A protein has these predicted regions:
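Soluble, non-transmembrane domains of envelope/secretory-pathway proteins that act on or interact
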Residues: 1-86
């Protein structure tokens, strides 16, 4: 695995997520590969969840705006992507 082998998967950095008309707030499946033990997920620097490595976390984005999504593992490795919600 490359150095710092923890990687967010399924979300591209810079992606724009659009709400479907008057539909429900968009939800993203937050998932990472290469982590050890427990993964800590942060949204704009605030912790939103802890899950065992290999498990996904569902996150709803109720408000439009820019979001920074970060994942960290117990070994101190991390990955980060930025998305926009419209």
């Amino acid at each position: 695995a490359p150095e710092g082998g923890l990687r967010i998967v399924g979300i591209s950095n810079g992606a724009t997520i659009r709400r479907a008309g008057n539909g429900p707030a968009p939800e993203l499946r937050l998932e990472a590969r290469g982590g050890q033990d427990e993964l800590i997920w942060l949204l704009n620097g605030r912790q939103i969840g802890r899950v065992p490595a290999g498990r996904a976390l569902q996150q709803r984005f109720s408000d439009a705006g820019r979001y920074q999504i970060t994942v960290m593992d117990d070994a101190g490795r991390y990955d980060r992507v930025e998305i926009s919600v419209r």
